[in-house]
């Protein structure tokens, strides 16, 4: 727990007085958040499914109205870049680009897997070992997930990638470390993984309100996206699903 808290303090040192609008549409959850100096001032979330196209503009307006009502000037827009839902990522990035361009503010990209790790790291109600590794998992299709493995400094030990799960997955990390698995992809991994060093953290989804530390750090470093040419981090090519024939297969 000591190392985990020190890492959180390290992030807090990077906080600025910037007012940032955060957008996440990487999974079936649609969310926005307005923050200043790391404090959440306004947030909107919907967990009902793929309603991003219908809801996102309204969520953004609520946050911008809050900023205007409190005489705050937006300094940047942050958006989750993926991996995740192809359609969701496109919707979120398109809205973020348009807003950043219209308001003439920088655009910040946040890796969705790192966003999920940040959520777990900052949840001090979790009693995790000091040497724990973090393995976020986003459901892809069948037994495939988007995943990576990170240490306490958010350094990727397994680079973000699509992974087809089997009983040997993550073996090199589980051999000598406790590994915390979380995200909607972990639900299909838990029945397969029987390793005693595996811990499963429930109910972890990417949320705009968890982007604060990562977005603030990027803002303080001047790490901004090219509004015109930035694209989502899909990690794999889109594969359209063939409609099932009503006559079956032969």
Model-found features: residue ranges?
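Conserved hydrophobic/aromatic positions in well-ordered beta-strands
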Residues: 33, 146-150, 233
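DPxDG-like acidic metal-binding loop motif
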Residues: 78-112
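Acyltransferase
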Residues: 201-250
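N-terminal beta-alpha supersecondary unit
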Residues: 13-81
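Phosphate-handling active-site elements
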Residues: 65-74, 100-110, 125-129
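Surface "functional belts" at beta-alpha junctions
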Residues: 12-16, 39, 51, 106-206, ...
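Polybasic, lysine-rich low-complexity intrinsically disordered segments
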Residues: 4-6, 10
